[in-house]
Amino acid sequence: KRRPPGFTPFR
């Protein structure tokens, strides 16, 4: 899977 730069599933 590819995630965009700065992808934050958790903060």
UniProtKB/Swiss-Prot annotation:
* Chief location bin: secreted
Q: Name one GO cellular component term.
A: extracellular region
Pfam short name (any one): Bradykinin
The GO biological-process annotations, alphabetized, read as:
defense response; regulation of blood pressure; vasodilation
Any one GO molecular-function label of the UniProt entry: toxin activity
For this protein, the record's InterPro entries field holds:
Bradykinin (IPR009608)
Function, please? Induces relaxation of arterial smooth muscle, by targeting bradykinin receptors (BDKRB). May cause hypotension.
Q: Which family does it belong to?
A: Belongs to the bradykinin-related peptide family.
Top-level taxonomic group: Eukaryota
Q: What is this protein called?
A: Wasp kinin PMM1
The protein's UniProt keywords, in alphabetical order, are: Bradykinin receptor impairing toxin, G-protein coupled receptor impairing toxin, Hypotensive agent, Secreted, Toxin, Vasoactive, Vasodilator
Expression across tissues? Expressed by the venom gland.
Lineage of the organism? Eukaryota, Metazoa, Ecdysozoa, Arthropoda, Hexapoda
> What is its subcellular localisation?
Secreted
